[in-house]
Amino acid sequence: MARGERRRRAVPAEGVRTAERAARGGPGRRDGRGGGPRSTAGGVALAVVVLSLALGMSGRWVLAWYRARRAVTLHSAPPVLPADSSSPAVAPDLFWGTYRPHVYFGMKTRSPKPLLTGLMWAQQGTTPGTPKLRHTCEQGDGVGPYGWEFHDGLSFGRQHIQDGALRLTTEFVKRPGGQHGGDWSWRVTVEPQDSGTSALPLVSLFFYVVTDGKEVLLPEVGAKGQLKFISGHTSELGDFRFTLLPPTSPGDTAPKYGSYNVFWTSNPGLPLLTEMVKSRLNSWFQHRPPGAPPERYLGLPGSLKWEDRGPSGQGQGQFLIQQVTLKIPISIEFVFESGSAQAGGNQALPRLAGSLLTQALESHAEGFRERFEKTFQLKEKGLSSGEQVLGQAALSGLLGGIGYFYGQGLVLPDIGVEGSEQKVDPALFPPVPLFTAVPSRSFFPRGFLWDEGFHQLVVQRWDPSLTREALGHWLGLLNADGWIGREQILGDEARARVPPEFLVQRAVHANPPTLLLPVAHMLEVGDPDDLAFLRKALPRLHAWFSWLHQSQAGPLPLSYRWRGRDPALPTLLNPKTLPSGLDDYPRASHPSVTERHLDLRCWVALGARVLTRLAEHLGEAEVAAELGPLAASLEAAESLDELHWAPELGVFADFGNHTKAVQLKPRPPQGLVRVVGRPQPQLQYVDALGYVSLFPLLLRLLDPTSSRLGPLLDILADSRHLWSPFGLRSLAASSSFYGQRNSEHDPPYWRGAVWLNVNYLALGALHHYGHLEGPHQARAAKLHGELRANVVGNVWRQYQATGFLWEQYSDRDGRGMGCRPFHGWTSLVLLAMAEDY
């Protein structure tokens, strides 16, 4: 036992004693899940428990069954959003959108059974056999850079994609009208990357429409396979028509010669669309433009029948795709017209195409630029035109990465006995929708709980209504206990991109409650629409916080421990803490129930503070009275010092069963395995100086006069520890874990690299303390300016060099690392440029 730990256990601080009653009888004690009414399912299950015990059945088995049932039961609190909130009747402006972030370009409706559209392309004749077909964003497909130049999150976007010798520009604009979400139009332009090239390639563009149910598509095909239009009808869209207009040269109106192939079949399943098209590109055709030599190309067979129609194809949906093959440069427009929009006026609306489409696109682009400057004021703050372009791309990439998902996740229930969860079979969560931004279109095209709070800090500055929509959907995922899964893998398309072993979410695992960061901003701004939303959201926010506070409780009052560290993996240098979001950040070398995690305690303190202030503002006296004492106890300096200040290290730290004497050594045939030397592990503070050490500062939990603030600023500003020319590194360069692999196949992740989300928190904290009177005010302000220059400057240089925002950045040379594009929390660079914290 570490020096001083015996004293702490025997004589807890008065603040800890005072808080124990609130902490252990605190939020949600009345019904175990945040004060909300019990669900009907919960009541029935409880009755079964009582009856089973009366009949002599095993109480432990029944309790496990009861907990398993609650894990996949939706919470009973009133929903924040109505059930039809995504319908065209309630939100027509959001019904259609680029809600398929994993494809290079596509749109769909916000519906459990959506109508989907998309684009594929291939350059003919560059490689033997089937040409490289581009459709879904992939990390290693060689495409790039790519990303949205403009995207307003609602009705307009312009994206540029570089693919070898090709440069594609995809644009869309929506036009409101009618009762079904209005009209929209695309323009896809393909030009040579090198304007001076003489050998212009032959390119095939594939425009497709997919239905996901019994909806009907009726194509009208003209001579030589040219699709004139597609008419259709669905219950949500009414009557509609798609039209693929004849191709032209960019900026011209004269039609350009193209070769056409059309294919119509049953929907094979959304994850299989790419492979189906690849497999059908097996017939040779001749492209014969007038006055030019013919060229061969691989095309789709001209099937116009609905294949597999019958018992096996009923209700499967349809897949209709038009291939257009021609020489670049080209521009093609694809138009969707809603029947109700056309019928809504006294005269038919002109088609949103040609010069009318050009005018609409330019008008929206100019409106975006003006709104962007008015919102973020980068030009006024003196940032260069290039940095302003970076800011626009950061915002647009985040908004263009918003997706709509629907499906059932797999949940492994918490049966209440730690370590036994693997003995329980996973169960399906109820079908739920999710409207969310994603971290990365190529690598993480789905919802992540702790990422989303950072995403919405950016989104809400631009469009608060989008943030309300996203938060409402996330809170709709709450189960009966108040748990939200940290990774949402909903629907076939999302599931197809995740290895099977990672599909299951464990109901005992938490995640940092970052959704409270945009909630705190809403409360600070005080917009009436936000406050009305928060009034509806409070019961679910309360339930979610109560679950976190209770389920992750640590060994001592006011201490907390991330569940989910696996001690039984001999190949890991340090067992991961995935629920914390910091994955391989070094914790106690030997996981145990004695651990106390500093970052988690700080997150709980932030949650208690935000929800107390929210309850007070809304006049919810009962919630405020319940959470207020807990918030005060968690923010008390004595309590934080008692549990997490490590005098021998001079910083705040985790506590647990730990030794530094661990290393990976080769042990054939196992490969690298962990070897523990001397000294043997003992209960002590964990000497891993890094992001975790800063959390009391990052979340602004310290008083500006605190004696602990100075030492934290010291390590933050020390280049031997966390300071680098490119931002704060995640783990001190002086740490024995710095830059170390966690296993043979697991390179360092949170062990030195610079991450934008934590650097943004650090900038906000330094800005905060730099504006509060205290002994460290001037130093905090100076460090803020220097850190901001380092972070913004490096992201800008890497964007110039690569065209991408990256997941993380090297603390050694600043280069982008990890996956790209990463317009998730790296988009926080925009708020750093705007000095908006």
Curated annotation (Swiss-Prot):
<feature type="glycosylation site" description="N-linked (GlcNAc...) asparagine">
    <location>
        <position position="657"/>
    </location>
</feature>
<dbReference type="Pfam" id="PF16923">
    <property type="entry name" value="Glyco_hydro_63N"/>
</dbReference>
<feature type="short sequence motif" description="Endoplasmic reticulum targeting">
    <location>
        <begin position="3"/>
        <end position="9"/>
    </location>
</feature>
<dbReference type="GO" id="GO:0006457">
    <property type="term" value="P:protein folding"/>
</dbReference>
<dbReference type="GO" id="GO:0004573">
    <property type="term" value="F:Glc3Man9GlcNAc2 oligosaccharide glucosidase activity"/>
</dbReference>
<dbReference type="GO" id="GO:0070062">
    <property type="term" value="C:extracellular exosome"/>
</dbReference>
<keyword id="KW-0812">Transmembrane</keyword>
<feature type="topological domain" description="Lumenal">
    <location>
        <begin position="60"/>
        <end position="837"/>
    </location>
</feature>
<keyword id="KW-1133">Transmembrane helix</keyword>
<keyword id="KW-0256">Endoplasmic reticulum</keyword>
<feature type="compositionally biased region" description="Basic and acidic residues">
    <location>
        <begin position="17"/>
        <end position="33"/>
    </location>
</feature>
<protein>
    <recommendedName>
        <fullName>Mannosyl-oligosaccharide glucosidase</fullName>
        <ecNumber>3.2.1.106</ecNumber>
    </recommendedName>
</protein>
<dbReference type="InterPro" id="IPR038518">
    <property type="entry name" value="Glyco_hydro_63N_sf"/>
</dbReference>
<feature type="region of interest" description="Disordered">
    <location>
        <begin position="1"/>
        <end position="39"/>
    </location>
</feature>
<keyword id="KW-0735">Signal-anchor</keyword>
<feature type="compositionally biased region" description="Basic residues">
    <location>
        <begin position="1"/>
        <end position="10"/>
    </location>
</feature>
<feature type="region of interest" description="Required for endoplasmic reticulum targeting">
    <location>
        <begin position="76"/>
        <end position="137"/>
    </location>
</feature>
<dbReference type="GO" id="GO:0005789">
    <property type="term" value="C:endoplasmic reticulum membrane"/>
</dbReference>
<keyword id="KW-0378">Hydrolase</keyword>
<feature type="topological domain" description="Cytoplasmic">
    <location>
        <begin position="1"/>
        <end position="38"/>
    </location>
</feature>
<dbReference type="InterPro" id="IPR012341">
    <property type="entry name" value="6hp_glycosidase-like_sf"/>
</dbReference>
<keyword id="KW-0472">Membrane</keyword>
<dbReference type="GO" id="GO:0019082">
    <property type="term" value="P:viral protein processing"/>
</dbReference>
<feature type="active site" description="Proton acceptor">
    <location>
        <position position="807"/>
    </location>
</feature>
<keyword id="KW-0326">Glycosidase</keyword>
<dbReference type="GO" id="GO:0006487">
    <property type="term" value="P:protein N-linked glycosylation"/>
</dbReference>
<dbReference type="InterPro" id="IPR004888">
    <property type="entry name" value="Glycoside_hydrolase_63"/>
</dbReference>
<keyword id="KW-0325">Glycoprotein</keyword>
<feature type="transmembrane region" description="Helical; Signal-anchor for type II membrane protein">
    <location>
        <begin position="39"/>
        <end position="59"/>
    </location>
</feature>
<dbReference type="GO" id="GO:0005783">
    <property type="term" value="C:endoplasmic reticulum"/>
</dbReference>
<keyword id="KW-0225">Disease variant</keyword>
<comment type="similarity">
    <text>Belongs to the glycosyl hydrolase 63 family.</text>
</comment>
<dbReference type="GO" id="GO:0015926">
    <property type="term" value="F:glucosidase activity"/>
</dbReference>
<dbReference type="InterPro" id="IPR031631">
    <property type="entry name" value="Glyco_hydro_63N"/>
</dbReference>
<comment type="pathway">
    <text>Glycan metabolism; N-glycan degradation.</text>
</comment>
<comment type="function">
    <text>In the context of N-glycan degradation, cleaves the distal alpha 1,2-linked glucose residue from the Glc(3)Man(9)GlcNAc(2) oligosaccharide precursor in a highly specific manner.</text>
</comment>
<dbReference type="InterPro" id="IPR008928">
    <property type="entry name" value="6-hairpin_glycosidase_sf"/>
</dbReference>
<dbReference type="GO" id="GO:0009311">
    <property type="term" value="P:oligosaccharide metabolic process"/>
</dbReference>
<feature type="active site" description="Proton donor">
    <location>
        <position position="583"/>
    </location>
</feature>
<dbReference type="Pfam" id="PF03200">
    <property type="entry name" value="Glyco_hydro_63"/>
</dbReference>
<dbReference type="GO" id="GO:0016020">
    <property type="term" value="C:membrane"/>
</dbReference>
<dbReference type="InterPro" id="IPR031335">
    <property type="entry name" value="Glyco_hydro_63_C"/>
</dbReference>
